[in-house]
Amino acid sequence: MDKLIVAKFGGSAIGVDGEGIPTILDRVKSLKSDSKLIIVCSAPLTKIDGKKRSLTDVMLDLGENAASGNNVTMEPIEQSYSNILQMVNDENKVECKKVIDEMLGLASESLTYANSEGKFEDEVRAKALAYSGEVLMSHVLNYILRSNDIQADSIALDDWPIITDDNIESTNFLFDQSNQRIEALNNKIKQYEVISIGGFIGKTEDGIITTYERGGSDRTAADIGILFHKKYETMIDLEKDSSVVSADPKVVENELDDVMELSYNEARLAGMFGMKLIDPIAIKEILENGVDMAVTITNMKSPEKITKIQRKPANQNGHPLKIVTGKKNCAILRIESTSAVDLLESLESEKRYSEFIILSPFTKDGLEFSRILFLDGDYVKRNEKYVLSFDSLATIAYQRGVITLIGDEMWRVQQIASKASSKIGDAGLNILNMDAQEETSRIIIVIEDSDDNVAKAIQAIHSERSKIKFV
């Protein structure tokens, strides 16, 4: 069986106006040496007022401003692609510029529509993001690859293999329908060394452009792997501009260890709780489709630094507390357990929403109540009426920060829960809730989300990690 690597390069990997592309070219040449290669692109970054911004965010701002009746200009996006175009050789430059102009023209039409209709949503929003971001970048990267003597091609939207449901702005992958649309991509895999495709973007069966949630390019890579894992020896490679370490380097500076292996469960939890490793829904989709596929996270600047994500890691001899992470802006719903069953079923089947954790229940006045930790407080606020409709006596606590300790083998750590809670107390923070489950080796600590409380808690627990004894 031939090898196939699905490599995703995110916005930070592509860099400001494509500054990371020379490194990407080196990685592509290495990856394609013994494998077929599909590249999944995110939108590039640019700089506005001295700050790095994704072109996705730039376009979202333009769309909202246009919908508010303001005059907007696409000049920052146009200038970014003009800079990237300089990496295309003379032989391919005219054709590449034509594609850029055509797609940015289509994105501009979406802004004009938003301005006239007073709204920037659904397919108008999806088209603007596709034509100014991921889809356009995949075509531009194709011309850059060709300019460097790489046999490459890209996938047009007409041949798009990722088919989704009708939830336009937060869509869901449909395997059976997608599996019927992979012939064009499969033919290109056989014909070329490298194929580029935009991440984050899908299409309905009727041809309407859709988008995943933010971070959805990871899902695109996973979905392509799911579609081809029986045809090729398939691996997902998420190329990052840094290594996976035991805490966020922006929060913790000292005693950080490289994390060499993670289970699917550990990677999913880390993603849910704020570590930018992999979109947890990508792991969920791999599991739901019954696929056992290797996923790696590679530091593209130091490719020897790799984190392997597997269903069951081969080596469990390392530190059992692999990662300490946390998330701000969470909310906790307290709801009668009988009503919670209906809510959870509705979230799964109707909303297709899974960014929550079910905490341990409690009993009061003879009634059992469930506690549901939502990892996006803003989502709950937007849908508060819907959430509370399942139980008029339910209550929601906002402004909750959550710290979690991650490691399937944490049962090997002596007194881990008490040590973690003690360190948070030493940092002067009050624990509002704590949930520890032996079955999942999961420890969740809830505190008030104010100032830098979450960062302080992560720092406090991580400082104890190197001193912890384990069996």
Q: Model-found features: residue ranges?
A:
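A conserved regulatory-domain signal marking ACT and ACT-like small-molecule sensing domains
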Residues: 305-471
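Residues within well-ordered alpha-helices
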Residues: 27, 141, 221, 282, ...
